[in-house]
Amino acid sequence: MFDGIGFMELLLIGILGLVVLGPERLPVAVRSVTGWIRALKRMANSVKDELEQELKIEQLHADLKKAESKGLANLSPELQESIDQLKQAAQSVNRPYQLDESNEQEPKIAPPQANIAETPTQSGDTHSKNNG
């Protein structure tokens, strides 16, 4: 971790930190700095893992296109089936939220039916009671 920093440099940094921060705040400062370093390492590792995964996916796509260009007619049925499964998996990853045409035509949840009983209003009676 400290490739270019020797023991004397670390000792000097520790003494300066002790003088500047004091013995009460130095352990807290060291803990917060190590927490930041851990968070940065975690973030860098997650970015690296995502990039590696994307590169693997791109390599699979390139291999699939290369196999298609060489001709799929000469392949065995098992290999053809696995390529078809790979294509389906790639399409499902690329478009996970795409709906089928059959799902668009038929709603999954039916709207509630309105069963409101109509009551006749007696507007003439209310006006006559208020007026007289």
UniProtKB/Swiss-Prot annotation:
The chain crosses the membrane at residues 2-22. Part of the twin-arginine translocation (Tat) system that transports large folded proteins containing a characteristic twin-arginine motif in their signal peptide across membranes. Together with TatC, TatB is part of a receptor directly interacting with Tat signal peptides. TatB may form an oligomeric binding site that transiently accommodates folded Tat precursor proteins before their translocation. The lineage of its organism: Bacteria, Pseudomonadati, Pseudomonadota, Gammaproteobacteria, Alteromonadales. The gene is tatB. Residues 86-132 are annotated as: Disordered. The Tat system comprises two distinct complexes: a TatABC complex, containing multiple copies of TatA, TatB and TatC subunits, and a separate TatA complex, containing only TatA subunits. Substrates initially bind to the TatABC complex, which probably triggers association of the separate TatA complex to form the active translocon. One of its GO terms (molecular function) is protein transmembrane transporter activity. GO terms for biological process: protein transport by the Tat complex. Gene3D superfamilies: 1.20.5.3310. The keyword Ribosomal protein does not apply. This is Sec-independent protein translocase protein TatB. Belongs to the TatB family. Signal peptide: none annotated.
